[in-house]
Design a protein with these regions (language model features):
Chain A
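Short beta-strand elements that form the blades of beta-propeller/WD-repeat-like
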Residues: 33-45, 83-93, 128-140, 185-192, ...
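Beta-propeller blade signature
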Residues: 52-57, 100-102, 143-154, 201-220, ...
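Repeated scaffold domains used in trafficking and secretory/extracellular systems
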Residues: 71-84, 116-129, 168-179, 231-241, ...
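Acidic, serine/threonine- and glycine-rich low-complexity intrinsically disordered segments
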Residues: 180-317
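Intrinsically disordered, low-complexity segments enriched in Gly and acidic/Ser/Thr residues
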Residues: 279-375
């Protein structure tokens, strides 16, 4: 019995030793900021990542953090849109249907309105009082499905199909880069894809731009307009159109079409125009961005008013089909000018920049998210007149994926 | 090692062998099992165990003697596996009932011989120069029952547990009357969680101390199951196929020749009987039908035929509580109770072997084939809001096998060879351009489309495997083992609805070879040591456009395992391994559907440290206790993980800096006399993200050093069983059992982020299972009834994916075995 007790003591001592080596990590809680700006933040990680919604009352100073703070969203790869004074949080669900959560802001805090179910879509845009969603196939012969969500009822009120197999006329499938309401039409620029096999997103037609024009709300195809001066307009999940106050629509081409995984377009990254009231490319307007910028290509842009766009660009060496450029510049489409923005962090310190940014459309200002390689993120205020960037609100614990305001 | 009573450490509690209903029934037939082979894996185990637990002292005197003999039963048949003890020396009789002590110090001893079902022999002998050095012993069969009951209720497996490795062995024979599959049985092991996405046949993910997926390897009788396909997996193999399941947590012994990194599960089918039939059928809720036939016949000349066949069928139409959306407007009706309507699963598998045993050229030579097929409907996506009504999968398996074993090629050298090749095909069928809701309503769209991704792609992995094992036992203290595992993979496929896909079909081929060398040494009864190394080389050919890219990767790993016995009741063990894992073929090539290939993956490397402790004691001989505790530390680098690809349409594997895990598990068991057993185990693991920089370009991660999300970190099981003998009639036994599963709540996403009240998580799971078993005629007829999820709790392993509601099962089993 004595040795039994002795053994028990050994055993307990060992177990105690084994189990006593844990440590807890405490987080500094930063109380939630109230405000009408909504920042969506993704903690950078390879797995188990959710987005967090943070609110702020100004974008030019202060600090926010996701540590113990922020409204957790179900997963990342979410897309956000504001319309009709509501904030829509949509899951990109890998082809599966998913829940869209809508919020409004009350007293500077996000308040959930409802959940409703939609498909995973690859393009969406506010049109009239609706949110138009389009699910785009990647396999040849399939049709795209569209859904109109009434933003008052927060329900799908209408749906239908679009033929994407025969749009290009070249035997390949059309994949919409984005959707845009232009006057009472929906403009849907697309790129041509093989939609097959090992080169599904590749094309044999890298040197054309197309826009499908649809009537709304019938979504009847009215016209396809084509331009061989550039490669396709926009990019996968990127809005390549900007509509000016006078109704003119400008389009950028990034020149990132690939064939067999290799960039194949011979056309430079450039900006073209569709004049107000027309559904044709204006053959008299062409702005070779690549030349104006010293060899760069546009990856994203945001229209801030007065003919000014804040553009993200990549150098020839950085060029990729999906990466957002970290070179920031101001393009004035009226004057066909490009100015590089100064005051951004050093390029070698930038991890990434946000591609869904906010502008009050004053012709001068945009607020752009920047994440540095040390993990800290900031909102930079871009001034188009001075072509300068100024560091503003600091966000800790993640990358800013979008900035919006209700 | 495949039989009861082998290699029990003398005098330990575990040695007081339990005699279960089944074992008691088997005792006579075991005599006929004399010449049955040992799988090489088991053979090595024997050697390891001898090394680790052999109580023989190194001969200190020159004047040692050889002493040998045989043990046979009163009807003249040899008894293999009987334990023979002379003083501190222990031997186990071989297939011919023979034992031999090579170096024994001449003096007077008490010799004792025990074997289940026989009266123990205990007599005094004197070993000396003038005494004869060979004695034949005859044991009398007992008619009374042995009174001792093993506290753990895992008698056969106790010795596996006592290896220097961090291993838990489950005695599957104890569960043969349950309706468990292998996965269900594993879920009751400390340190193991099997996470399922639904009912019978659903996808599973086994995690062992925090590692899961391809980090864990599965073996069937020591042969890797990597190439078996979906028709033969742990979620469809019934428990009756297995005799024992060994779970290696962390350091994996060399003789399981594979590049497991997080642990290994070895299903030991054994072949205890030369002539037997074991038939069972169960019926249960959700239209579930399962049957198993295991049979073997062996002639006196050594010709043998073995057959294992099993079938599972279920509609899995259990009720779930969901937010059902309106198919047209997308509006949710929260908390709707609906039946699953597209979740049928069935599989049918036959394993047949024909060959000879106990010939001069082979102890065993078997030619076999495994034929199988499965069909699975897919009800939901990764969330239950995604409902499908037509999408399904099929797979089949056509696998010829060869097994060859020969002992003592030269004295002390044993050879074991296994080979198989799987011609099976897998197919994913999603061609209905429909959208379903939870009530089974659907919208039919025009054109060619799908519910998720349109495909009928059918492919075969053409996977082959050859394992060779050589073991050489120099003497009682030293032995050596050499193993080689070669595997090949060459995927080919086509899609009948998209024939142009064939033109794009790329070369997808890998060859992998793992060479292992081991050395085992033990000095005395107190400690033992096992050193091993593995060299892995993998050659992969990845077709890219028009050229084939060939990559060759090689890694060298090594480890040691050691154990120390303070005394008979207290054992301490420790092991370390530098483990390597090569990227899997699926990870390199993708699967054409949901998984994109990454040919730039680097091998994954980890340091594994295990420390374990086993302690047992009894009070007044009727109250028996045992405690085992294991601690584990892992540090994995170039950890292979899955994430979404650039346009988020498929998963793709990548390397990450890694994760660490520091955790452990504790199990305590208790038994009272021979009618009550109870146990509880608890596992805790602290799995920490060690990825400091993430993304491209890399930025400092805010979740560096955070606990990994969506992995259970605290869980446990409890069980109580009562058994009553001779109920109603002599030889009829009744038992009642209860099992409890507890899984602590855990977060779906990173714990440190977001407002705590608004976070998504998997709630605490608490489920109760009960079972009742009545066996007649000493186990020839068995009737069991089970209720799973007694309290009808909403159970989730994966966020939002509900597991079955309360279910009832009834199982009938018939077992008979005959003398040849």
């Amino acid at each position: 019995m004595k040795s039994t007790l002795k053994n028990a003591c050994y055993a307990m001592a060992l177990i105690a030793g084994i189990s006593s080596c844990s440590k807890d990590k405490s987080n500094d809680l930063i109380s939630e900021n109230k405000g009408n700006y909504i920042l969506t933040v993704t903690p950078v990680a390879s797995t188990g990542v959710a987005d967090y919604l943070l609110t702020a009352d100004n974008l030019e100073s202060g600090t926010l953090s996701t540590a113990g703070n922020g409204l957790e969203q179900d997963g990342t790869f979410r897309y956000y849109v504001t319309t009709n004074n509501k904030f829509f949080s949509m899951l990109y669900g890998q082809g599966n249907p998913g829940a869209v959560t809508t919020y409004n802001i009350q007293n500077g805090k996000l308040s959930k309105l409802s959940n409703f179910q939609t498909e995973t879509v690859q393009a969406f845009a506010p049109v009239n009082n609706d949110l138009l969603l389009v699910k785009i196939p990647r396999t040849y012969g399939n049709k795209a499905n569209w859904y109109q969500v009434d933003t008052d009822k927060l329900l799908i009120t209408s749906e239908g199909q679009l033929d994407v197999a025969n749009l290009t006329g070249n035997g390949e499938t059309a994949h919409f880069s984005w959707l845009k309401q232009v006057n009472n039409k929906v403009f849907a620029p697309y790129f041509s894809i093989k939609a097959c096999c090992a080169d599904g997103f590749g094309t044999n037609y890298p040197d054309s731009a197309w826009v499908a024009v649809y009537d709304y709300p019938s979504m009847k195809l009215e016209k396809i307009i084509k331009d061989n001066r550039t490669s396709f307009i926009g990019r996968y999940f990127v809005d390549g159109l900007g509509v000016l106050e006078n109704g003119d629509t400008y389009a950028f081409s990034s020149s990132v079409a690939t064939t067999g995984g290799v960039f194949s377009s011979k056309k430079p990254s450039a900006i073209t125009r569709i004049n107000a009231g027309t559904t044709e490319f204006d053959q008299n307007y062409y702005f070779n961005f690549q030349d104006a910028s010293g060899g760069m290509n546009i990856t994203n842009w945001i229209y801030i008013g007065g003919g000014n766009f804040v553009v993200n660009a990549t150098t020839a060496a950085e060029k990729g089909a999906y990466n957002t450029g970290v070179h920031i510049g101001i393009v004035n489409v009226n004057n066909k000018t490009f100015k590089a923005v100064t005051g951004m962090p050093d390029l070698d310190k930038i991890g990434s920049v946000t591609d869904h940014n906010f502008t009050p459309k004053d012709g001068r200002t945009a607020y752009m998210g920047v994440t540095l390689k040390d993990g800290s993120s900031f909102v930079y205020k871009i001034d188009a007149v001075t072509a300068t960037a100024t560091q503003g609100l600091k966000v800790e614990g993640g990358t800013i994926t979008s900035i919006s305001k209700l | 090692m495949e039989r009861d009573g082998n290699l029990k450490p003398w005098g330990s509690l575990f040695c007081k062998t339990a005699e279960t209903v089944v074992q008691r029934f088997y005792k006579r037939q075991l005599l006929n099992d004399i010449k049955s082979y040992m799988q090489i894996k088991q053979l090595l185990l024997v050697i390891l165990l001898i090394l680790f637990h052999n109580q023989q002292l190194v001969a200190q005197q020159n004047a040692t003697q050889k002493f040998s003999g045989t043990v046979s039963s009163d009807d003249g048949l040899p008894i293999p596996g009987a334990t023979v003890k002379i003083g501190e020396y222990i031997r186990v009789t071989d297939n011919k009932g023979e034992f031999s002590f090579d170096q024994i110090i001449p003096k007077s001893y008490t010799i004792s011989i025990v074997y289940i079902g026989f009266k123990p022999i205990r007599k005094s002998i004197t070993i000396g120069e003038k005494q004869k050095n060979r004695i034949e012993f005859v044991m009398d069969a007992t008619t009374h029952e042995l009174k001792n009951v093993d506290v753990v209720g895992r008698t056969k497996v106790t010795e596996v547990n006592r290896q220097a490795f961090n291993v838990t062995a489950l005695d599957a024979t104890k569960m043969h009357n349950s309706t468990l599959d292998i996965a269900g049985a594993l879920d009751r092991v400390a340190g193991v969680r099997v996470r399922e996405t639904g009912g019978l046949g659903s996808n599973f993910n086994l995690s062992l101390n925090g590692f899961s997926g391809n980090h864990i390897r599965f073996f069937l009788d020591g042969v890797p199951m990597d190439n078996f396909g979906s028709s033969f997996q742990i979620n469809n193999i019934p428990i009756n196929i297995a005799e024992r399941i060994e779970v290696y947590k962390g350091v994996v012994p060399m003789w399981l020749g594979a590049d497991a990194l997080g642990g290994a599960v070895n299903i030991v089918t054994g072949d205890r009987f030369r002539n037997y039939i074991d038939v069972s059928y169960s019926i249960g809720s959700f239209n579930t039908h399962r049957s198993v036939i295991n049979a073997a016949a062996t002639s006196k000349s050594g010709f043998t035929v073995q057959l294992n066949a099993f079938q599972n069928f279920s509609d899995n139409n259990y009720k779930v509580t969901v937010d059902a959306s309106d198919i047209n407007t997308g509006q949710y009706s929260p908390g709707t109770r609906v039946k699953r309507f597209h979740d049928q699963y069935h599989n049918e598998t036959v394993i047949a072997n024909v060959g000879v045993v106990d010939k001069s050229f082979a102890d065993k030579l078997l030619f076999g084939v495994t034929l199988g097929q499965n069909y699975k409907e897919i009800q939901t996506g990764a969330r239950m809001v995604s409902v499908f009504g037509q999408w399904h999968r099929r797979g089949n398996m056509i696998m010829p096998t060869l097994k060859y074993q020969k002992k003592d090629l030269i004295k002390g050298l044993d050879l074991n060879f296994n080979a198989n090749y799987n011609f099976g095909k897998e197919q994913n069928i999603d061609t209905a351009y429909r959208r379903y809701d939870w009530f089974g309503n659907y919208k039919q769209y025009e054109g060619k489309g799908s519910e998720r991704t349109r495909t009928m792609y059918k492919y075969g992995n053409n996977a082959g495997l050859a394992t060779t094992m050589l073991n050489y036992k120099l003497n009682d203290n030293h032995s050596f083992a050499l193993s080689n595992v070669f595997s090949t993979f060459d995927r080919k496929g086509s899609d009948e609805i998209n024939p142009s896909n064939n033109a794009y079909e790329q070369k997808q081929k890998t060859n992998k070879n793992i060479l292992g060398l081991g050395y085992m040494f033990n000095t005395a009864d107190h400690w033992s040591l096992n050193l091993f190394s593995k060299y892995i080389i993998q050659n992969s050919i990845v077709g890219q456009q028009n050229l084939n890219q060939t990559t060759t990767q090689s890694q060298f790993g090594y480890g040691l395992a050691t154990s120390y016995n303070f005394n008979r009741n207290l054992q301490l063990k420790a092991s370390y391994e530098k483990a390597n894992r090569m990227p899997e073929a699926t990870e390199i090539f993708g699967d054409v559907e949901n998984f994109e290939g990454n040919s730039n993956l680097k091998p994954e490397v980890s340091d594994n440290v295990n420390v374990g402790l086993m302690y047992s004691f009894s009070l007044q001989d009727v109250n028996r206790f045992s405690i085992s505790a294991n601690a584990i530390y892992r540090n994995a680098s170039n950890f292979i993980y899955y994430q979404f690809n650039q346009n988020q349409s498929k998963l793709v594997a990548g390397n990450r800096d890694g994760v660490t895990n520091f955790g452990g598990d504790i199990e305590a068991r208790y038994s009272f006399k021979d009618w009550l057993t109870a146990g509880v185990n608890v596992t805790y693991q602290n799995i920490i993200n060690q990825q400091e920089y993430e993304g491209n370009p890399p930025v400092l991660s805010p979740v560096y050093k955070d606990r990994m999300p969506n992995i259970p970190f605290l869980y446990g099981n409890g069980d109580v069983a009562f058994s009553f003998k001779n109920v109603g009639k002599k030889g009829n036994n009744l038992s009642f059992g209860y099992n409890l599963l507890y899984v602590h709540a855990f977060y779906l996403y990173w714990p440190s982020r977001g407002t705590s009240g608004d976070k998504y998580g998997i709630p605490k799971q608490l489920s109760h299972d009960v079972n009742l078993l009545y066996s007649l005629k000493n186990g020839r007829y068995n009737i069991s009834a089970e209720c799973k999820n007694l309290n009808d709790a909403l159970l989730y392993d994966n966020f939002s994916l509900q597991k079955p509601s309360r279910a009832f099962y009834l199982k009938l089993r018939y077992f008979i075995n005959k003398t040849a």
